[in-house]
Amino acid sequence: MKYIEVEFSFDPEVMDGEIVLAEISELPFESFAEETGKIMAYAQEEDFDKNALEAFQWLKEHPVEYKFNEISDINWNEEWEKNFDPIEVSDKCIVRATFHKVDKKYEYDLLIDPKMSFGTGHHATTHLVLKHMFDFNFQGAHVLDMGTGTGVLAVLAIKLGAENALAIDNNPWAFDNAGDNIKLNDCEGKITVEIGESELIEGKTFDYILANINRNVILADLPQYEKALNKKGVLLVSGIMTHDVEHVLNKAKEVGLILESLEEKDNWNLFVFKK
């Protein structure tokens, strides 16, 4: 299977890598790898849209250069193993790969082999959700994990006592990867993974909705989340940069959601909403 690698380069003293990643994630790439002053984005050759990239207005307005490479037979395991260290979410929780050895015993030991999917806990967006999940009682809850990626949020929800979780992603790689991680964490039968978008939740209701996606999807889907949230339910929204906070707050108010709290980490924000 052939892939197109687009290498974005920039001066890290001029451009924040987190902002670059947030903006280019709006384009149809499957995965990203980061280095100082450089982000590599990957898409299958048949899915790569060169015209969309060249027409992307944000790139025209900012000092970011890019070039294309055609590659095949990527060893994804080798790629993510280079940069994936265990991450401690709290004194009680660690996210690690199967090859990591840890000395300390954690109450919540989450095994995640990310492959190409987003969501290991290293990025501020995922870390914020993992951290705040410990603020709530998931016992017996019905949970929705939108944009599941590796499935790590759904897995933690089950470990925290949720009765079941629906994990949704529009990326086939995420579907496969989340399924593998569900097995690794002995959560089979409790987490259902589906490929698609918010139309899959029509007619369903949840006690907790975990939405760690991007600005455009969040703004478009907030009305569906409000409908799907039980009366005393909680919606955790992540993946929003500071300059987009007001847009999300305005949309949430418009659909009848009430802001309970807001936390920022590395220019990324997590919202806790209730009805």
Q: Which role does the model predict for each range below?
A:
Residues 2-104:
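N-terminal auxiliary segments of SAM/dcSAM-dependent transferases
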Residues 75-139:
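SAM-dependent Rossmann-like transferase core, predominantly class I methyltransferases
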Residues 31, 65-67, 94, 164, ...:
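Conserved beta-strand segments of alpha/beta enzyme cores
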Residues 116, 120-202:
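Conserved SAM/SAH cofactor-binding pocket of Class I
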Residues 170-275:
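S-adenosylmethionine
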